[in-house]
UniProtKB/Swiss-Prot annotation:
Cystine bridges: C155-C363
Effect of inactivating the gene: Decreases chitosan levels during growth in host tissue. Attenuates virulence in a mouse intranasal infection model; decreases fungal burden in mouse lung. Triple knockout of CDA1, CDA2 and CDA3 results in an absence of cell wall chitosan, melanization of surrounding media, an increase in capsule size, sensitivity to cell wall (sodium dodecyl sulfate), osmotic (NaCl) and heat stress, and avirulence in a mouse intranasal infection model.
Family: Belongs to the polysaccharide deacetylase family.
Organism in which the protein naturally occurs: Cryptococcus neoformans var. grubii serotype A (strain H99 / ATCC 208821 / CBS 10515 / FGSC 9487) (Filobasidiella neoformans var. grubii)
Positions bound to acetate: D166, Y257
Annotated stretches, region: Disordered: 406-447
Outcome, altering R254A: Abolishes CDA1 activity and results in avirulence in a mouse intranasal infection model, CDA1 localization is unaffected
UniProt cross-references to InterPro entries, sorted A to Z: Glyco_hydro/deAcase_b/a-brl, NODB_dom, Polysacc_deacetylase_ArnD
Effect noted on mutating D166N: Abolishes CDA1 activity and results in avirulence in a mouse intranasal infection model, CDA1 localization is unaffected
Sequence ranges assigned to domain NodB homology in this UniProt record: 159-358
Record-level GO cellular component terms: extracellular region; fungal-type cell wall; plasma membrane; side of membrane
Membrane disposition: Lipid-anchor; GPI-anchor
Proregion residues excised on maturation: 445-470
Name of the protein described by the UniProt record: Chitin deacetylase 1
Length: 470
């Protein structure tokens, strides 16, 4: 488990790394920029220079609409909204990994064939102290940006932007929802289970408005630091609270901080979930994550102005070099990030006219109904071959989001302890790996962009990102 003490040590050790990937120094012309949008209902968006960690709290806005129990969704084949309200006592405590000894988690675990899950150790979440996890071929995104062919990391068509927001619903989400509704923009919301339990009506409005809902775990941990049982609990409870709220279950998830490896992938596959990360672009020795850094503003390591400048570089320097579309990382958990989106980023994209804004499921060329297990036309049973021997393989589910088939994964490190044990740790030395069907350097013949996240940027994401505000 990634403790606060461990996070503090990691943050201190990575102070130099963070300084390289985020900052508050920007072109002076950006500091004078004012909002291109007043927001829905004349809501006043602060000047860009005022979007800082010390910004005064905005007044919140109401949802443009709420929906009654039994209302019919726009998603083809979906059931009506559930008629029973959520009972908080029926769910785990907020913002902590759920207990693994509950009957539900035991039932979910019973459906997981652990012989088909690579027995890699849990990681420390820290690349500087976990060399063994880097070198054992597990395809750990956090340390090197490794992805598998079945990870969703881009939109196939050039100039299509897969828009997404993480960590909500929050008190500031209604402003974003209202703006998206006003402009007829669809996005993907990667929601935290604890936030859904706190604000189910916001999730229903997102869903009923045609946005894609996806999973972002129950308490926002770095998944590779968890045991198998804890991963199942984090994903399973989030799947359950979403279905209890909407009547459908997402078939995609985004690992917090992008922290994923083949063990997490294999467990998620057996739960019917396909991972979605964000696009990276590699040009020579430079690797850029399509991360606006809006989540750094609240912590003071970025400002609205510096995040906007990052966004402009993505849009003007890196996206045009791709043969494909792209997926970005943005957030609706913070006031500043929502103000940045509604007042600056989205209005500029609309005014520019170059990029088509779509939810991720739509940017893949699929109907929104393909985003949910119950309504997807692709009900292929997940097939996973045994994760043992020199050529272990796993199959990533393709329910609604088919991008590939069986993917070869290298065998686990010799003598490793099964990650199902809470006491599992790793140690040793080694260099970053590039094996199997992993992608961490360049595009394939299909024109796919490079998917190396970049160890420095990813490390900073794990470090600073642990300051998670509920």
């Amino acid at each position: 488990m990634f403790t606060f003490a461990a996070f503090s040590a990691l943050l201190i050790s990575l102070a130099g790394v963070v300084a390289q990937t985020t900052g508050t120094s920007v072109d002076s012309s950006i500091l004078t920029k004012t909002a291109d949008s007043t927001g829905p209902s004349g809501f006043s968006i602060p000047a860009l220079s005022e979007l800082t960690s010390g910004a005064p709290t905005d007044s919140t806005v109401a949802l443009y609409s709420t929906f009654a129990a039994g209302a019919t969704p726009t998603v083809s084949g979906a059931p009506v909204l559930p008629t029973s309200a959520l009972t908080i006592a029926d769910y785990p405590a907020l913002d902590v990994t759920p207990p693994t000894n509950s009957s539900l988690v035991k039932d979910w675990m019973a459906k997981i064939d652990l012989s088909k899950v690579p027995s890699y150790n849990v990681t420390t979440g820290d690349c500087s102290t976990d060399a063994a996890a880097i070198s054992d071929g597990r395809c750990w995104w956090t340390c090197g940006g490794c992805t598998r062919e079945t990870d969703i990391v881009e939109c196939p068509d050039k100039n299509v932007w897969g828009l997404s927001y993480d960590d909500g619903p929050s008190p500031f989400t209604p402003l974003l929802i209202d703006y998206l509704q006003e402009k007829n923009i669809k996005t993907t919301f990667f929601v935290v289970g604890s936030r859904v339990l706190s604000r189910p009506e916001m999730l229903q409005t997102e869903y009923m408005s045609g946005h894609q809902i996806s999973i972002h775990t129950w308490s926002h941990p770095a998944l590779t630091t968890l045991t198998n049982e804890e991963i199942v609990a984090e994903l399973g409870w989030t799947m359950k609270v979403i279905k209890d709220t909407l009547g459908v279950t997402p078939n995609t998830f985004r690992p917090p901080y992008g922290d994923i490896d083949d063990r997490v992938r294999a467990i998620a596959a057996q739960m019917g979930l396909t991972p979605v990360i964000w696009t990276s672009y590699t040009d020579g020795s430079t690797t850029v994550n399509f991360d606006t850094n809006d989540w750094h503003i609240s912590g003071g390591t970025a400002t609205g102005a510096s995040s906007y400048e990052t966004f402009e570089k993505i849009l003007t320097e890196y996206a045009p070099k791709l043969d494909t579309g792209f997926i970005t990382l943005e957030h609706d958990i913070y006031q500043q990030s929502v103000d940045l989106a509604v007042g600056y980023i989205l209005p500029q994209v609309l005014a520019n006219g170059t990029y088509q804004l779509k939810s991720i499921i739509n940017c893949l060329g699929k109907d929104t109904s393909e985003a949910y297990i119950e309504t997807s036309s692709n009900q292929t049973t997940t097939q996973i071959t045994a994760a043992t021997g020199s050529q272990s393989t796993f199959f990533q589910p393709i329910v609604g989001t088919a991008t590939g088939a069986e993917v070869s994964a290298p065998s686990e490190a010799t003598g490793s302890t099964a990650a199902g044990s809470a006491a599992s740790t790793t140690s040793g030395s080694g260099a970053s790996a590039s094996t199997g069907a992993a992608s961490n350097t360049s595009s394939s013949g299909s024109g796919r962009s490079a998917t190396m996240g970049g160890a420095l940027i990813a490390l900073a994401a794990v470090a600073v990102g642990m300051v998670y505000v509920a």
